Regions:
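Extended, charge-rich low-complexity interaction segments
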Residues: 66-70, 118-119, 124, 157-167
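Hydrophobic/aromatic beta-strand patches that form the interior of the parallel beta-sheet core
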Residues: 3-5, 32, 56, 92-94, ...
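Well-ordered, non-membrane alpha-helical segments in soluble/globular domains
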Residues: 17-19, 69-77, 105-110, 148-162
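Short helix-loop-beta junction
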Residues: 20-30, 113-122
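Glycine-rich phosphate/pyrophosphate-binding loop and the adjoining helix
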Residues: 20-21, 127-206
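N-terminal beta1-alpha1 ligand-phosphate binding loop
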Residues: 1-29
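Helix-loop-strand module that forms the ligand-binding subsite of alpha/beta enzymes
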Residues: 12, 40-119
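A short beta-strand-loop structural module common to alpha/beta enzyme folds
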Residues: 5, 28-42
Length: 206
């Protein structure tokens, strides 16, 4: 069984795209998805963790780390292992950042690796995806709609490759990617325009 842990993503569409892109590589009965929240059913999650052969965490990265909810969850899992729980699954991660370079997720990836080491869980492989805001902010511009589509196509192959590692339960080198169809300068320019637009909207509301 493959357990997908939803650690939260900037855009629901991105989250669905990532899981759906990998889903075709697993039989439906193998795949269980659980969202990490403060109110999640811990007993059920423990059963999933014990039964899973592979665990895939998908999450956003904020200031070099995953969210506090995800960190709290990992700490709780670590304590459960210390308390006698056994997790034989291989751990994989797909981390998103709105910054251009996927390498910006590398520190958060190390946090997850350290968690696996402390919890005696085998690390499988990490995929860090940069430029995560591009598609969802494409707006009405035909140019940016096209660029958004190109980014989806760009991510797709890497997500499917990650799914193959998960399916075969093998380890690999972490991979960090970004939308090469758009330059870093152009991406930052667009992000700055979005921030200014949001600020103007907030001022207008006040």
């Amino acid at each position: 069984m493959v357990l997908f842990l939803d650690g939260g993503c900037v855009s629901a569409a991105d989250q669905d795209f990532g899981v759906d892109s990998m889903r075709e590589y697993f039989r439906q009965e193998e795949l269980i998805t659980a969202k990490i929240t403060e109110s999640m059913d811990w007993n059920q999650i423990c059963r999933y963790l014990e039964e899973a052969q592979a665990i895939v965490l998908t999450a956003d990265v904020y200031l070099d780390s995953v969210s506090s909810e995800v960190l709290t969850f990992l700490e709780r899992v670590e304590q459960a292992v210390i308390g006698g729980e056994s997790i034989g699954a291989i751990f994989y991660a797909v981390l998103y950042t709105e910054l251009y370079e996927g390498e910006q997720t590398s520190i958060a990836m190390e946090v997850l690796k350290n968690f696996c080491f402390r919890a005696n869980i085998t690390w499988g492989r990490g995929l860090g995806i940069g430029g995560n805001k591009l598609e969802m902010d494409s707006g009405k511009s035909n140019f940016w709609k096209w660029m958004g589509k190109q980014m989806v196509d760009f991510r797709l192959g890497f997500l499917q490759e990650q799914a193959l590692f998960v399916r075969e339960r093998i380890q690999g080198t972490d991979v960090y990617i970004h939308p090469k169809e758009v330059s870093r300068k152009e991406y930052i320019r667009k992000m700055n325009r979005r921030v200014k637009k949001n600020n103007r909207a907030k001022i207008a509301q006040n």
